[in-house]
Design a protein with these regions (language model features):
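Catalytic cores of DNA base-excision repair glycosylases
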Residues: 2-208
């Protein structure tokens, strides 16, 4: 398994040298907000919405004191806008009041923030602090199963399995690359197996 994992990591690194988050942000709390908005929404849509949102509320304090209804108006096109707006304002208030205005750097503290689950917390830990992080979104879960790196569809279960086999220093970048690969090649329906660099390692393609 160790050799297989190393080969998969190398192939993904060659295809995507820059393992970057697709969300646009300038401040740590802006990434937290963008990730919250991305739930059940595309990164492209979030990136269309956030410039105006961040211009209207240019500081953490501005978000913490924001009228939730006004935030709703800015994020309406992201879906589930009422819940997302409530979480954004509440999370920013908690950052201001309990975390000295900074996004915390531990899983336990992050999970206390409204609207922040393990997927969001892992992304923040990996992108903001360079910590080992396994972001189990739908792409990661699907491809990990197809490659035989994990079994099951429960995010926490898949996260544990991937943590057990991925080198910690590679885990965050691996997940960013898997998302890109899932969008371009290993799609949910009609995956492009004919041009897949990971085909030699694919359990589903080999019929196992």
């Amino acid at each position: 398994m160790e050799e297989k994992v190393a080969a998969i990591i190398a192939a993904l690194r060659e295809r995507y040298p820059d393992a970057l988050c697709a969300l646009h942000y300038g401040k740590d709390y802006e990434l937290m907000i963008s990730v919250r908005l991305s739930a059940q929404c595309t990164d492209a849509r979030v990136n269309q919405v956030t410039p105006a949102l961040f211009a209207r509320f240019p500081t953490l304090e501005a978000f913490a004191e924001a009228d939730v209804a006004e935030v709703e108006a800015y994020v309406r096109s992201c879906g589930f806008f009422r819940h997302k707006a409530q979480d954004i304002v509440a999370a920013c208030r908690m950052l201001r009041d309990e975390y000295c205005g900074r996004v915390p750097d531990t899983m336990e503290q992050l999970l206390r923030l409204p609207g922040v689950g393990r997927k969001t917390a892992n992304l923040l830990l990996g992108d903001l602090y360079g910590k080992p992080a396994v972001v189990c979104d739908t792409h990661c879960i699907r491809i990990a199963n197809r490659l035989g790196l994990a079994r099951g569809k429960e995010p926490e279960k898949v996260e544990r399995q991937l943590r057990a086999i991925l080198p910690p220093e590679e885990s965050s970048d691996f997940c960013h690359r898997i998302v890109l690969f899932g969008r371009e090649v290993c799609t949910a329906r009609s995956p492009h197996c004919d041009r897949c660099e990971l085909r030699p390692y694919c359990r589903e393609f080999s019929g196992e």
